[in-house]
Curated annotation (Swiss-Prot):
Its EC number is 5.3.1.5. Binds 2 magnesium ions per subunit. The gene is xylA. Gene3D superfamilies: Divalent-metal-dependent TIM barrel enzymes. This is Xylose isomerase. PROSITE patterns: XYLOSE_ISOMERASE. The keyword Membrane does not apply. The keyword Cytoplasm applies. It catalyses: alpha-D-xylose = alpha-D-xylulofuranose. It is found in: Cytoplasm. The lineage of its organism: Bacteria, Pseudomonadati, Pseudomonadota, Alphaproteobacteria, Hyphomicrobiales. Its main location: cytoplasm. Signal peptide: none annotated.
Length: 436
């Protein structure tokens, strides 16, 4: 049943690359076969509940610009928001969505009331999922907006805040499991510091490790089959965040013995804030065996903060999905649009148009990446570059069968005098441009 919020807009359909209809897909075809698999099953698109339905359009210099009929902190408004959200998912044909607890329920007076409100809306979501076929990609807890978390959640100097946060995460994992969610995400927006003058780094990192182990233990206790994901970000809102980037997260996971239990949800905008490219973080996560899922968006490269815009750069998407595909593709993860409208984009149709453009951009990137893989456009030059390591002697060297003394003797006796070879960066950049 239509809520009327989107007027007479009908379900978004594919019309082909020559279409000028802003409410149609030009490149995204869910059933198109790419590398032997449906495009929808490769991309696994999800809509972010928070940016799409709860963001008021404010910025540091101005308040709310969006006037949504559900912008009240009541259960009635929460259910109206859910009605509009699931209508949106159906219009867009999005197979998944993601949420924080605070996005979907009204704020209660205490933990018990928060839990009651969450359970009520989860039951409502279950009905909506059954009616529409939309599924939950992942759930998470908002442990950063409420003032109780201003000094952190897991890393808070007050153990009562730690306990409140841990109990909240339990309820959110329960909700995620009840709704058939395929992952559970931890993002430590306040797990960091503003100044070292009042921060015990070792204590806070140890607290964070204990918190993470509690989550992993509870996952196994209840038989949750999904993946636990950490989302790296270097800063914002804190000056320095402990889950800075993929490399930092991996070191943290290793220290606390959960590197085989937890993977990463990588956001393009966060990679940029950390001084990396998106594909760097994806490639590193693959190399370390912790790639899980992605939050798809882009940052304004001039702004210096997290602008969460919809992706529109096909070459960037092609390289991103190249690494996703090269790593075997998504297992339980997917492509969550952690992106929001600009505050002047007031029309309900703008919500659809932003997602349509992002989905088309990702589809073009996916197809370009798939073609590069089929043609071995990058993998063959890479194999050629490292071919020397495939020899028997080089394999022994790699496996550690020679000591430094033996290596030195071998270099001297064989008069080893290697000469450099071209890295062919310009050629490879031109190769990529042929596909995009």
């Amino acid at each position: 049943m239509s809520t009327g919020f989107f007027g007479d807009i009908q379900k978004i359909k594919y019309e082909g690359p020559d279409s000028t209809n802003p409410l149609a897909f030009r490149h995204y075809q869910p059933d198109e076969i790419v590398l032997g698999k449906r495009m929808e099953d490769h991309l696994r698109f999800a809509v972010a509940y928070w940016h799409t339905f709860t963001w008021p359009g404010g910025d540091p210099f101005g308040g709310q610009t969006f006037l949504r009929p559900w912008f009240e902190d009541t259960m009635k408004a929460a259910k109206l928001k859910a009605d509009v959200a699931f209508e949106f998912f159906s219009l867009l044909g999005a197979p998944y969505y993601c949420f924080h607890d605070a996005d979907v329920r009204p704020e209660g007076r205490n933990f018990a009331e928060n839990t009651k409100n969450l359970n009520e809306i989860v039951d409502y979501f279950a009905e909506k999922q059954a009616a529409t076929g939309t599924k939950l990609l992942w759930g998470t807890a908002n442990l950063f907006s409420n003032r109780r978390y201003m000094s952190g959640a897991a890393t808070n100097p007050d153990p009562d805040v730690f306990a409140f946060a841990a109990a909240t995460v339990k309820t959110c994992i329960d909700a995620t499991q009840k709704l058939g969610g395929e992952n559970y995400v931890l993002w430590g927006g306040r797990e960091g510091y503003e100044t070292l003058l009042n921060t015990d780094l070792k204590r806070e990192l140890d607290q964070l490790g204990r918190f993470l182990n509690l989550v992993v233990e509870y996952k196994h206790k209840i038989g949750f089959k999904g993946t636990i994901l950490i989302e790296p970000k270097p800063q914002e809102p804190t000056k320095h965040q402990y889950d800075y980037d993929v490399a930092t997260v991996y070191g943290f996971l290793k220290k606390h013995g959960v590197e085989n239990e937890v993977k990463v949800n990588i956001e393009q905008g966060h990679a940029i804030l950390a001084g990396h490219s998106f594909e760097h973080e994806l490639a590193l996560a693959n190399a370390l065996g912790i790639f899980g899922s992605i939050d798809m968006n882009r940052n304004d490269y001039q702004s210096g903060w997290d602008t969460d815009q919809f992706p529109n750069n096909v070459p960037e998407m092609a390289l991103a999905y190249y690494h996703v595909l090269a790593g075997g593709g998504f297992k339980t993860g997917g492509t969550n649009f952690d992106a929001k409208l600009r505050r002047q984009s007031l029309d309900p149709a703008d919500l659809l148009i932003g997602h349509i453009g992002g989905m088309d951009c990702c589809a073009r990137g996916l197809k370009a990446a798939a073609k590069m893989i089929e043609d071995k456009a990058l993998s063959q030059p890479l194999a050629d570059r490292y071919a020397g390591w495939e020899s028997a002697e080089a394999q022994k060297l790699f496996r550690g069968e020679y000591s430094l003394d033996e290596i030195t003797n071998w270099v001297e006796s064989h008069d080893v005098n290697p000469q450099p070879k071209s890295g062919k960066q310009e050629l490879l950049e031109n190769v990529v441009n042929r596909y995009v």
